[in-house]
């Protein structure tokens, strides 16, 4: 298994993984699937901002992906990013999520980011455990802020401080 930077050719596999999460999980709070052009536009937008899109690959097959983007689009949040990590269902439980997220944390540090935020559906105990194990702490619990599959969803926010800068002008 290798982790590498994605390229445009990976967008079809990324779309498949994304759409599975849309249809079968509460990890993505969208109701409709997307086409490859949608994920290609998403990929290109990340590239324009200098943000990484990583894929895990085994025997030439994309098994997962990870990325981060602006947490909020205001200048004051320029050192804070929110990330996403998704693993193909046939490859879950093999530690790929941990490997992708660890590499993504390294990339955020390389990009000079200060905080990485995770927004996790509160019933996703595996994701919350993974984030705790990598140093993330719970910073907020937001009950019933989303809906999917005919039920209210709670949101857990977790964050990881990526550096030790005492003040923003030290960044």
Curated annotation (Swiss-Prot):
| Annotated Gene3D superfamilies | 3.40.630.30
Q: Which CDD domains match?
A: NAT_SF
Give residues annotated as binding acetyl-CoA. 85-87, 93-98, 124, 133
Q: Write out the catalysed reaction.
A: L-methionine sulfoximine + acetyl-CoA = N-acetyl-L-methionine sulfoximine + CoA + H(+); L-methionine sulfone + acetyl-CoA = N-acetyl-L-methionine sulfone + CoA + H(+)
Chain sites annotated for binding substrate = 72-74, 82-84
Gene Ontology terms, MF aspect: acyltransferase activity, transferring groups other than amino-acyl groups
Under which EC number(s) is this enzyme classified?
A: 2.3.1.-
Which keywords are on file for this protein?
Acyltransferase, Transferase
Q: What class of enzyme is it?
A: transferase
* Keyword Magnesium appears in the UniProt entry: no
Traits of the deletion mutant:
In minimal medium, cells lacking this gene grow normally with MSO, but growth is inhibited by MSX. In rich medium, growth of cells lacking this gene are partially inhibited by MSX, only when its concentration is at least 50 uM.
Q: Which PROSITE patterns match?
A: GNAT
Q: Which SUPFAM superfamilies match?
A: Acyl-CoA N-acyltransferases (Nat)
Q: What does this protein do?
A: Plays a role in the resistance against the toxic effects of L-methionine sulfoximine (MSX), a rare amino acid which inhibits glutamine synthetase (GlnA). Catalyzes the acetylation of MSX. It can also use L-methionine sulfone (MSO). Also catalyzes the acylation of free L-amino acids using an acyl-CoA as acyl donor.
What is this protein's record name?
L-methionine sulfoximine/L-methionine sulfone acetyltransferase
């Amino acid at each position: 298994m290798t982790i590498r930077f994605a390229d445009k050719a990976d967008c079809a596999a990324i779309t498949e993984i994304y759409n599975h999460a849309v249809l079968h999980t509460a990890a993505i709070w969208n109701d409709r699937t997307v086409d490859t052009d949608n994920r290609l536009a998403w990929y290109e937008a990340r590239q324009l901002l200098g943000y990484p899109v990583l894929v895990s690959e085994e025997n030439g097959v994309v098994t997962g992906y990870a990325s981060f983007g602006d947490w909020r689009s205001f200048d004051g949040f320029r050192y804070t990013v929110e990330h996403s990590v998704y693993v193909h269902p046939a490859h879950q439980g093999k530690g790929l999520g941990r490997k992708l997220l660890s590499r993504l944390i390294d990339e955020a540090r390389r990009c000079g980011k200060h905080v990485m935020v995770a927004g996790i559906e509160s019933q996703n105990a595996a994701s919350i455990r993974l984030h705790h194990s990598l140093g993330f702490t719970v910073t907020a619990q937001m009950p019933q802020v989303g809906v999917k599959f005919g039920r209210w969803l709670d949101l857990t926010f977790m964050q990881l401080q990526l550096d030790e800068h005492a003040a923003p002008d030290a960044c």
